[in-house]
């Protein structure tokens, strides 16, 4: 009986020790990276100018291809996951849900060619790549296919979310703004 209680107590404390290890890993790993990316993004906004960024966002927002294909690709390549989502703040309210849908998927689909984007989820691509390597199949076509299918899927995710947002606007009797107000 005492052994079971002791084992339970050790397990319980071990749970918090493991949580502490994860926390320390985040403090020394992802958090400094995110803070650095935030500083760089805000510095770029200051250097380029808030008005110019807003105008660029308006131009990107006017076209679904730039909104859900180009902007998520550039944002994900430059700012990685999860900072690419912050670019959505420059888009009008109407397109924010759709941008998030496209950008969140781009963090996964670009990993094959650009592993710096989302190293925490690289294991998905590497698992598939390991199977192909075992079969002696080259990985180049896989990485390119992963990217191209991802880009097309990103676009459709954004576009479909646009359509569902419009349905909910009508259903709720609201109209989301199509201009940027920061």
From Swiss-Prot:
Keywords assigned: Cell inner membrane, Cell membrane, Membrane, Phosphotransferase system, Sugar transport, Transmembrane, Transmembrane helix, Transport
PROSITE patterns on file: PTS_EIIC_TYPE_5 (PS51107)
Residue ranges of every copy of the PTS EIIC type-5 domain listed in the record: 1-182
Protein origin, superkingdom: Bacteria
Topology with respect to the bilayer: Multi-pass membrane protein
UniProt GO BP: phosphoenolpyruvate-dependent sugar phosphotransferase system
Subcellular location: Cell inner membrane
Transmembrane stretches, start-end: 29-49, 68-88, 132-152
Family annotation (InterPro entries): PTS_IID_sorb
Induction per the UniProt record: Activated by sorbitol and repressed by glucose.
One Gene Ontology CC term in the entry: plasma membrane
Comment block on domains: The EIIC domain forms the PTS system translocation channel and contains the specific substrate-binding site.
Its job: The phosphoenolpyruvate-dependent sugar phosphotransferase system (PTS), a major carbohydrate active transport system, catalyzes the phosphorylation of incoming sugar substrates concomitant with their translocation across the cell membrane. The enzyme II complex composed of SrlA, SrlB and SrlE is involved in glucitol/sorbitol transport.
NCBIfam families: EII-GUT (TIGR00821)
Protein name: PTS system glucitol/sorbitol-specific EIIC component
Record organism: Erwinia amylovora
Gene expressing this chain: srlA
């Amino acid at each position: 009986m005492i052994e079971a209680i002791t084992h339970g107590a050790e397990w319980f404390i071990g749970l918090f020790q493991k949580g502490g290890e994860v926390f320390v890993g985040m403090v020394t790993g992802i958090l400094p990276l995110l803070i650095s990316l935030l500083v760089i993004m805000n510095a770029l906004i200051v250097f380029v100018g808030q008005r110019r960024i807003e105008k660029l966002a308006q131009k990107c927002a006017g076209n679904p291809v730039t909104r859900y294909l180009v902007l998520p690709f550039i944002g994900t390549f430059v700012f990685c996951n999860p900072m690419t989502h912050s670019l959505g703040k420059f888009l009008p309210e109407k397109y924010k849900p759709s941008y998030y849908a496209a950008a969140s998927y781009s963090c996964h689909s670009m990993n094959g060619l650009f592993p710096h984007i989302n190293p925490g989820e690289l294991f998905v691509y590497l698992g598939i790549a390991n199977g192909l390597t075992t079969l002696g199949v080259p990985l180049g076509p896989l990485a390119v296919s992963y990217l191209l299918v991802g880009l097309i899927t990103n676009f459709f995710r954004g576009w479909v979310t646009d359509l569902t947002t419009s349905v909910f606007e009508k259903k709720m009797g609201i109209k989301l703004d199509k201009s940027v107000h920061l």
